[in-house]
């Protein structure tokens, strides 16, 4: 009897193959450590491949005399790798019992040989994890298959982005805070358009805001060299992830001397940024002591943000860093829109100072780490009428000083990964199109308030509503009850009620019959 043909194997992507290989670490490494194990190895492979390509180019152009000259690598932003740091050496020893120590040594020597990587790579990490040698070797084999030189398909970016998102997804709520979904970062970049100047993120996580901003500039044929990047990150392991993420993509950034708390150890005290993008921790409690940071210059002109919640501490930190024409896009939990007490006083002052440009409520389930509803705030230091040239395009901004644009995106988004959703390119284009039309001259022809989607509110309207920034207090929502055909609805209810009464009579008759047959007739 002929053997039945086996079902064809489902092809899996390179990213999926790597994820499966990383998942083999289960039992040897805590899931929360996967990202550090995998991404550090991936960085090592990438750095080595780039080094070998540069070494070959130097040899062909100048001869063997200069192949070990560090300057010939640095001029092209290539990290110089001592022999024991090269991927070929790691793979030659992949099955050895001391491979973890060799990986640690490789990373240590790379960092020492390249000052730009100071503080970026894990220190004595693999030896401390005691990973099963066979599982580590299997992971090395998978990473070895990657062609990191495939620039056309952005292999570097694809793998790094995929892993960061998968790790955040796997870790779920309460963890993975370092990752902001790409569609949200893209929306912020497309709204504030960081083409030229200083870009700052006060809580930069793994650097996603920077990466997508550079992609935005590239996609619009801008010059990445015109954008200077500054960031700060509190968690040391995430700080290292960010440095690696940016280094892999050839993005230069000033992330401060160390991982540090933005509030108590500001690494960029005198910075004035043209663009700020941020996704601060939501509703962070006890972010300062009762008597701490009382006279901090970042609060000048405002109340001191309460210790119970850092939301307005983040807002005022951002405001203090904006340049004369600076614009910021950042995310906060919805509670910040309507908090009372000190927060209300600060919010009112922000509105009176003409800083709030747009408030955009996002759909639920965009984030892997929380299911709470989130708001995108756009602040603008200069809402006056002016003409500017951005990336070769002349824009004529109208005066928007006593106006705020409210948008509600809760009906947008498409299913993505389990129960999550994402804002599609079409969704984002609709949102940014409305926002940019509203900002510019001639908006009377290009912008209009749309029920359940957007509304341009005056200062007086906002003041009348007690300076709340909840979009639903301004955007018109259709009362669907008004659209009901009363006669048709009543006839439907009449029919349903008749059916229920008939069924009730039948049930009563059946019950009386049963009792009568048992000899216990019920007289009504």
Kindly give the residue locations of the regions a language model identified:
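Accessory, often C-terminal, charged low-complexity segments
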Residues: 282-304, 311, 344, 349-352, ...
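Conserved Class I SAM-dependent methyltransferase catalytic core
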Residues: 17, 24, 33-46, 239, ...
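Active-site lining segments that contact anionic ligands and/or coordinate catalytic metals
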Residues: 272-273, 309-311, 325-331, 356-357, ...
């Amino acid at each position: 009897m002929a053997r039945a043909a086996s079902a064809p194997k489902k092809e899996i992507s390179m990213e999926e193959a790597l994820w499966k290989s990383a998942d083999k670490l289960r039992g040897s490494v805590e899931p929360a450590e996967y990202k550090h194990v995998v991404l550090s190895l991936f960085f090592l492979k990438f750095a080595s491949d780039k080094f070998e390509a540069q070494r070959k180019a130097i040899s062909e152009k100048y001869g063997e005399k200069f192949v070990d000259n560090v300057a010939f690598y640095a001029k092209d932003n290539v990290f110089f790798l001592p022999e024991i740091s090269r991927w070929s050496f790691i793979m030659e020893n992949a099955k050895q019992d001391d491979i973890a120590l060799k990986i640690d040594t490789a990373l240590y020597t790379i960092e020492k040989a390249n000052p730009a990587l100071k503080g970026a790579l894990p220190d004595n990490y693999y030896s401390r994890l005691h990973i099963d040698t066979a599982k580590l070797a299997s992971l090395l084999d998978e990473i070895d298959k990657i062609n990191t030189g495939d620039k056309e398909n952005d292999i570097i970016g694809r793998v790094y982005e995929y892993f960061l998102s998968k790790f955040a997804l796997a870790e779920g709520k309460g963890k993975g805070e370092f990752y902001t979904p790409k569609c949200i970062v893209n929306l912020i970049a497309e709204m504030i358009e960081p083409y030229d100047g200083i870009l700052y993120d006060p809580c930069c996580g793994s650097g996603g805001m920077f990466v997508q901003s550079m992609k935005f500039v590239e996609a619009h044929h801008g010059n990445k060299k015109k954008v200077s990047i500054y960031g700060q990150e509190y968690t040391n392991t995430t700080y290292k992830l960010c440095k690696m993420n940016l280094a892999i993509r050839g993005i230069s950034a000033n992330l401060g001397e160390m991982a540090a708390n933005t509030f108590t150890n500001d690494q960029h005290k005198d910075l004035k940024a043209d663009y700020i993008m941020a996704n601060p921790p939501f509703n962070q409690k006890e972010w300062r002591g009762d008597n701490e940071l009382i006279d901090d210059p970042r609060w000048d002109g405002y109340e001191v943000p309460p210790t119970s919640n850092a939301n307005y501490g983040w807002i005022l930190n951002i405001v203090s860093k904006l340049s004369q024409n600076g614009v910021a896009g950042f995310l906060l939990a919805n509670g910040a829109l309507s908090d009372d007490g000190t927060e209300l006083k600060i919010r009112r002052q922000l509105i009176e100072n003409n800083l709030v440009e747009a408030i955009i409520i996002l759909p639920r389930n965009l984030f892997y780490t929380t299911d709470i509803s989130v708001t995108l705030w756009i602040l603008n230091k200069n809402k006056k009428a002016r003409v500017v040239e951005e990336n070769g395009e002349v824009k004529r901004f109208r005066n928007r000083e006593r106006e705020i644009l409210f948008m509600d995106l809760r009906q947008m988004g498409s299913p993505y990964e389990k129960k999550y959703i994402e804002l599609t390119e079409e969704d984002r284009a609709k949102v940014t199109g409305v926002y940019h039309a509203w900002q510019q001259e001639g908006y009377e022809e290009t912008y209009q308030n749309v029920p359940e989607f957007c509304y341009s509110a005056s200062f007086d309207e906002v003041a009348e509503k007690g300076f709340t920034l909840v979009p639903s207090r301004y955007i018109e929502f259709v009362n669907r009850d008004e659209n009901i055909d009363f006669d048709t609805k009543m006839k439907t209810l009449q029919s349903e009620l008749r059916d229920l009464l008939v069924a009730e009579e039948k049930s009563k008759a059946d019950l009386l019959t049963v009792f009568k047959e048992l000899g216990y007739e019920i007289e009504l």
